[in-house]
């Protein structure tokens, strides 16, 4: 056996051996209980970063643990491989997106393998492979057949110089194109949507089923879905047959409406605008149309609006109220119109004050003597209805129902539930995405591509310029095809799908990844689903996780799966942070290697630098290359540091000294095990053990108990590693090295260590003479008898002051404890010749003698 711990040598050796043994392959046809452990798959950027390492190491520890605990484990990996960066690479480097992507996949896969991850690579998927996106297209057609995929016009970001559509991430915070520098415009295009709103209520109520998800994530989804209970009310337009429909959660304030506001894009806007206001309104619409939704609705931005000249009528009191348009009202939300109640809505109060619009109080606090107070801010609390006709004096909470009932009887309103969630826009005017499998025929309209003709493959030899229409729209040979229905000339859809679609079902493909006849067999999906433990970043709390839940429910309704939810438990790991240095005067970050950490100054200006932990990134110059860490210390040390430094859900602060500390710990384990001479003997029996052996065995089984508990539920890896260190120290300090208990301790230490540091555990296991892999062993079980304490430490006090301690039998009665304390050397020395007035005995802890002063 090696005298020195050579991480690189043993890690390379065992990684190859595990491949040769097929140790990580997913067991089929096993009667063991199943466990599906899954990390969110990465975009193949080409380089692994520490955030990746943390994610995949966490999942790997869980997968390895569950195998040791007797589960058959599915632990796959793949690549979320479509997306904009590949097209940018094609433009900037003149490389086909596929070449760039597959090169990056190969590079990242090799980096992942050096971490010693127990991944079943036979199930590897890449979403850009026709073998995968054939089934993405097939699933799109399932949605289409179910009436859940449709087309309508929607706004996109348009670069007027490059004459191309831009993704949101290609537009800077000021609204300019990142490539051409042009001011980005908003343009309407006909695009594809998925009807996720049909599932809004299910997506909301089923959050209650997700008991293994962080409350924070569930709350984020709940807010995103945004259920509101209220009323749909109609305000007639004066001098017209038109009516303005609004949704409100405060129908009790309807008598306080002093204006209504339309979205600039609302179809009624031109109809209600008077001739005198036409020019101003059109100019306002032009100005607003080029702003993003985020810009228009930002809370810290002043709300802008303009009078249309039109007038509406409040049907409840007959009052005439002005009609405005404003930037903060979006046509896609609700009805595209809102009623203004400035007395009882904070935003409306500010807007009305700036526009000098009337403010009418209709709710006052209970016991208020003034029904028409002058307000300095909106009153938004419940209260008593006033200035509200027949509803005066009613509690506002009761008034909501009363107003709705009245509106329904009168025919100008009804109860309604509304959701903030909008249908999912899935169209992308991009090349490097999954083609939408439909054909547009002049005679037949939109026609689905038959299943037999899938996949619709992306054409090759495409020119990427970054200008003009999507590259697909220029591929005439690819676009022009016969209609699948009538055979006449037709054109393919040139939009590709949002990459979130690819990641909304990949967890199902893993259950049957090599199937070339189906997306997945129902039996296999039902066998493995749900994912038992999903691990990924909090940044995916809403879109990816919500879309995956939506997909699962649709596929359930299509008879393709038997589960309601895709992910049983969710762990959102924290970020990996490192020290960053920033010049507060210039705002520039300074590379870590150019700063003296003991006296951090800007090397160019001499200015003192701000020093703080921040998420690792290229722009902050504080990234740590995983390959350098692995090269210096090995994968096991990197894994141990990642797991020990912080609880998995918390942010982790990188510290080279702590990495070094984990390396030293593994070296201690190496020396400890290799210094042990293995002895054969009889089965352990507590009755035959010496006190020292019992103490050591108690330490062994305490470690088993504590680590097993740490790895259940919340996965507190950091405290589990601490317990490994305690056990290592106990073994290092033990004198009974030739005993069977010591042998049990050494082997237990290695099995407990195996999920965390799999390579060194395997090497040392074989050094002990074992011929089969440690990863095929069984997780050790706690022996309750070993935890029983024969003796305890008893504190002896005189007048409340500690005079010393003695060892006593653990099961001693109060009387026995007093007797043992009196008869001890400490007792005799301190009580000699003194009268004991009182004795206080705290069983298992102390005896306190009260004596006269």
From Swiss-Prot:
Subcellular location: Cytoplasm
Residue positions binding ATP: 618
Position of sequence motif 'HIGH' region: 42-52
Alphabetic keyword roster: Aminoacyl-tRNA synthetase, ATP-binding, Cytoplasm, Ligase, Nucleotide-binding, Protein biosynthesis
GO cellular component: cytosol
Family: Belongs to the class-I aminoacyl-tRNA synthetase family.
Full protein name: Leucine--tRNA ligase
Source species of the chain: Crocosphaera subtropica (strain ATCC 51142 / BH68)
Name of the gene encoding the protein in the UniProt record: leuS
């Amino acid at each position: 056996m090696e005298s020195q711990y050579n991480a690189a040598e043993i890690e390379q050796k065992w990684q190859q051996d595990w491949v040769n043994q097929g140790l990580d392959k997913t067991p089929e046809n096993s009667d063991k209980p199943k466990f599906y452990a899954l990390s969110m798959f990465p975009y193949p950027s080409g380089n692994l970063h520490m955030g990746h390492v943390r994610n995949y190491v966490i999942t790997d520890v869980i997968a390895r643990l569950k195998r040791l605990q007797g589960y058959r484990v599915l632990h796959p990996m793949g690549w979320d491989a479509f997306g904009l960066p590949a097209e940018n690479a094609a433009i900037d480097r003149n490389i086909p997106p596929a070449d760039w992507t597959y090169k990056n996949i190969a590079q990242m896969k090799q980096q992942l393998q050096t971490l010693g991850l127990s991944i079943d690579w036979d199930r590897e998927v890449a979403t850009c492979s026709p073998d995968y996106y054939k089934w993405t297209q097939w699933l799109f057609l399932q949605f289409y057949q179910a009436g859940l995929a449709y087309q309508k016009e929607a706004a996109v970001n348009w670069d007027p110089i490059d004459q191309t559509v831009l993704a949101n991430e290609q537009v800077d915070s000021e609204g300019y194109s990142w490539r051409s520098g042009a001011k980005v415009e908003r343009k309407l295009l006909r695009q594809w949507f998925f009807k996720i709103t049909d599932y809004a209520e299910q997506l909301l109520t089923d959050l209650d089923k997700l008991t293994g998800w962080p409350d924070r994530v569930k709350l984020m989804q709940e807010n995103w879905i945004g259920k509101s209970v209220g009323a749909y009310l109609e305000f007639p337009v004066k001098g017209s047959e038109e009516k303005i429909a609004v949704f409100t959660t405060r129908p009790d304030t309807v008598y306080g409406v002093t204006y209504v506001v339309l979205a600039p894009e609302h179809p009624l806007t031109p109809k209600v605008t008077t001739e005198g206001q036409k020019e101003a309104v059109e100019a306002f619409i032009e100005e607003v149309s080029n702003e993003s939704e985020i810009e228009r609705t930002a809370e810290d931005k002043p709300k802008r609006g303009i009078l249309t000249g039109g007038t509406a009528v409040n049907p409840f009191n007959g009052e005439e109220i002005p009609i405005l348009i404003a930037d903060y009202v979006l046509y896609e939300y609700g009805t595209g119109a809102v009623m203004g109640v400035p007395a009882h809505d904070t935003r409306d109060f500010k807007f009305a004050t700036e526009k000098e619009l009337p403010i009418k109080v209709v709710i006052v606090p209970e016991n208020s003597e003034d029904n028409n107070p002058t307000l300095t801010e909106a009153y938004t609390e419940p209260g008593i209805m006033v200035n509200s006709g027949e509803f005066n004096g009613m509690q506002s909470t009761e008034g909501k129902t009363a107003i709705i009932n009245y509106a329904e009887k009168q025919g100008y309103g009804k109860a309604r539930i509304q959701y903030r969630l909008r249908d999912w826009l899935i169209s992308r005017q991009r090349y490097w995405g999954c083609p939408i499998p439909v054909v547009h025929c002049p005679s037949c309209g939109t026609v689905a591509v038959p299943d037999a003709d899938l996949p619709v493959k992306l054409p090759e030899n495409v020119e990427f310029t970054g200008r003009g229409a999507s590259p697909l729209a220029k591929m005439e040979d690819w676009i022009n095809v016969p209609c699948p229905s009538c055979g006449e000339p037709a054109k393919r859809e040139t939009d590709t799908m949002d990459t979130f679609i690819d990641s909304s079902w990949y967890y199902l493909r893993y259950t049957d990844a090599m199937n070339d006849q189906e997306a997945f067999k129902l039996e296999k999906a039902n066998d493995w689903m749900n994912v038992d433990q999903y691990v990924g970043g909090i940044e995916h709390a809403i879109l990816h996780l919500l879309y995956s839940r939506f997909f699962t429910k649709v596929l359930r309704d299509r008879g393709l799966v038997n589960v309601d939810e895709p992910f049983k438990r969710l762990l959102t790991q924290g970020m990996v942070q490192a020290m960053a240095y920033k010049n507060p005067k210039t705002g520039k970050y300074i590379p870590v290697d150019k700063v003296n950490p003991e006296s951090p100054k800007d090397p160019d200006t001499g200015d003192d630098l701000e020093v703080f932990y921040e998420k690792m990134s290229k722009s902050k110059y504080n990234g740590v290359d995983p390959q350098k860490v692995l090269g210096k210390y090995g994968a096991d040390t990197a894994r141990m540091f990642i797991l020990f430094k912080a609880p998995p859900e918390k942010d982790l602060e990188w510290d080279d000294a702590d990495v070094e500390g984990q390396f030293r710990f593994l070296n201690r384990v190496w020396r400890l095990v290799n210094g042990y001479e293995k002895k054969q003997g009889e089965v352990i029996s507590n009755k035959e053990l010496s006190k020292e052996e019992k103490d050591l065995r108690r330490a062994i089984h305490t470690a088993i108990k504590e680590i097993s508990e740490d790895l259940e539920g919340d996965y507190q890896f950091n405290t589990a590693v601490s317990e490994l260190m305690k056990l290592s120290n106990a073994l290092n300090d033990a004198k009974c090295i030739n005993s069977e208990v010591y042998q049990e301790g050494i082997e237990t230490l290695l099995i407990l260590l195996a999920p965390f540091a799999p390579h060194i555990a395997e090497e040392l296991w074989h050094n002990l003479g074992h011929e089969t892999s440690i990863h095929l062993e069984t997780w050790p079980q706690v022996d309750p008898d070993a935890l029983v304490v024969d003796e305890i430490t008893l504190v002896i006090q005189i007048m409340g002051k500690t005079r010393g301690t003695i060892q006593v039998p653990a099961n001693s009665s109060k009387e026995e404890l007093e007797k043992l304390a009196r008869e001890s050397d400490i007792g005799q020395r301190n009580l000699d010749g003194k009268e004991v007035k009182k004795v206080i005995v705290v069983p298992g802890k102390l005896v306190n003698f009260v004596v006269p002063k």
